[in-house]
């Protein structure tokens, strides 16, 4: 009797030492444990009870299946599997082997029964717990004192686990979300300032208040790498980012403390703006890069201490990252480069700062060096890359064109357009500016080069047709408009111009 009880507590302690988490363990003869990752079971139940008849096994298995189903539903898991181990002095008197060999299935829950019999102790232990040393359970341990000592050792392990969980829970008490709420208030305030000064969707207003604008950054307005994180384009953009910052920022600030959170948030905002500066020529604004930096900080915790992460936060944060990235790639006009840059910046900033009392100074220093090297390297590339310099020129020219400053556009782009590798976008904006000031021959030459680079650009063929018709080169005009109609047959203005050119040829 005492040997079986001794074995029961020894097995429980063995499982805890093997990474199992105690869910329930009191004065009763029942212990529930959560299995570590990559185990064949999700849960293990140790049940010390003398079985008389097989029907007791059947009834108990069905009851445990219902309990596991409730747990599965609460945790939102797709499936759960329980290893249900009976510790019984004797086996049931009737036919029980068939029950013990068959896994009980009920919907998305499965229960695998097993018996450890006092009369077949070593054989059963070897079958159910092959990693357990059966030599530790011999007749010399069959005493009340040894059983109590084994029980006390197990309970001490339970207390140790509880202390560890309290320590992990204390991670969320390192700071109050002061800066999170401050940034939320600041971005709401800035939104109203934008609205009363021209509108938050007005590009000129956004740029005036500090939006990321590549040409101005290249001219030395470095503060534009930081100021976009408090500006938002429209009420929907503000609402989405405010909700995201409230849900993610509060968790990060509680984990890392307010000081570390501030540095992570600002570093992520800057790296997000740098990535946008390098990969996107368009003006941009928003806290998305900094918010993705918060996700990066949580991702760092997930990778550096996976068990604590799963117990305190869970896998939902990974789902949030995937959903946000997927949403960004699926919807047009989303600055994904800024999102990814912020995610990377937040990750390395978190690794450099670490959680409070984290230690590991060497790794943190390396992370800080990597963060700075990445930021400086990409910024240097953005400032000196020919393609990026051209993108900045195109953006600047587009703004001048919208303001009606066509001659300034030609002055800005003529030198770049003379290069053989000038992009189609640059050639097209210079061409339409030349059209506005009457430089038709120059515009024709530019558009002819543009359609060679982008042969499916129907708008350029249409503009070419207009220019050829203006110069009375009707054969060329007809050929150009036919190509435009072929590329976009439903465009009515193309068809109208085609009819006009054909009529002029006939007359």
Swiss-Prot record:
Superkingdom of this protein's organism: Bacteria
UniProt GO MF annotations: serine-type endopeptidase activity
A Pfam family this chain is assigned to: Rhomboid
Positions of TPR repeats: 424-457, 458-491
Major place of residence: membrane
Reaction it catalyzes: Cleaves type-1 transmembrane domains using a catalytic dyad composed of serine and histidine that are contributed by different transmembrane domains
Active site location: 288, 339
Protein's name according to its UniProt entry: Rhomboid protease GluP
Organism: Bacillus subtilis (strain 168)
């Amino acid at each position: 009797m005492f040997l079986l009880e001794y074995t029961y507590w020894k097995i429980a302690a063995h499982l805890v030492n093997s990474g199992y988490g105690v869910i329930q363990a009191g004065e009763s003869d029942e212990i529930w444990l959560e299995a570590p990752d990559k185990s064949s079971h999700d849960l293990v139940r140790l049940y010390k009870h003398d079985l008389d008849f097989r029907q007791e096994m059947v009834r108990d298995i069905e009851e445990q299946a219902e309990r596991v189903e409730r747990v599965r539903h609460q945790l939102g898991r797709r499936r759960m599997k329980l290893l249900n181990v009976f510790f019984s002095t004797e086996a049931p008197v009737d036919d029980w082997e068939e029950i013990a060999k068959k896994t009980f299935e009920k919907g998305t829950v499965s229960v695998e029964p097993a018996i450890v019999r006092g009369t077949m102790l070593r054989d059963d232990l070897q079958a159910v717990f092959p990693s357990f040393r059966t030599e530790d359970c011999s007749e010399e341990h069959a005493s009340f004192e040894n059983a109590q000592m084994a029980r006390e050792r197990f309970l001490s392990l339970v207390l140790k686990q509880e202390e560890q969980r309290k320590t992990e829970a204390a991670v969320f008490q390192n700071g109050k979300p002061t800066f999170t709420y401050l940034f939320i208030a600041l971005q709401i305030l800035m939104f109203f300032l934008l609205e009363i000064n021209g509108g938050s969707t007005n590009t000129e207003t956004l740029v005036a208040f500090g939006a990321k604008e590549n040409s101005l950054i290249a001219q030395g307005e470095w503060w534009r790498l930081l100021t976009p994180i408090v500006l938002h384009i429209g009420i929907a953009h503000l609402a989405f980012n405010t909700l995201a910052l409230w849900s993610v920022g509060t968790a990060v600030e509680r984990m890392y403390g307010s000081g570390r959170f501030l540095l992570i948030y600002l570093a992520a905002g800057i790296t997000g703006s740098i990535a946008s500066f390098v990969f996107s020529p368009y003006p941009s604004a928003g806290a998305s890069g900094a918010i993705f930096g918060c996700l990066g900080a949580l991702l760092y915790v997930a990778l550096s201490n996976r068990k604590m992460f799963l117990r305190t936060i869970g896998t939902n944060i990974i789902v949030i990252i995937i959903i946000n990235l997927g949403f960004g790639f699926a919807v047009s006009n989303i600055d994904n480069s800024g999102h990814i840059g912020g995610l990377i910046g937040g990750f390395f900033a978190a690794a450099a700062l670490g959680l409070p009392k984290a230690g590991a100074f060497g790794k943190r220093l390396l992370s800080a060096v990597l963060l700075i090297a990445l930021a400086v390297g990409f910024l240097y590339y953005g400032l000196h890359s020919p393609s990026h310099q051209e993108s900045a020129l195109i953006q600047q020219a587009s703004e001048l064109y919208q303001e009606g400053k066509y001659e300034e556009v030609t002055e800005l782009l003529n030198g770049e357009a003379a290069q053989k590798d000038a992009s189609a976008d640059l050639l097209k904006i210079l061409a339409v500016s030349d059209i506005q000031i009457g430089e038709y021959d120059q515009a024709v030459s530019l558009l002819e080069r543009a359609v060679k680079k982008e042969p499916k650009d129907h708008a350029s063929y249409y503009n070419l047709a207009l220019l050829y018709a203006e110069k009375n080169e009707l054969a060329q005009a007809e050929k150009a408009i036919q190509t435009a109609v072929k590329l976009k047959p439903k465009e009515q203005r193309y068809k109208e111009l085609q009819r006009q050119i054909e009529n002029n040829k006939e007359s």
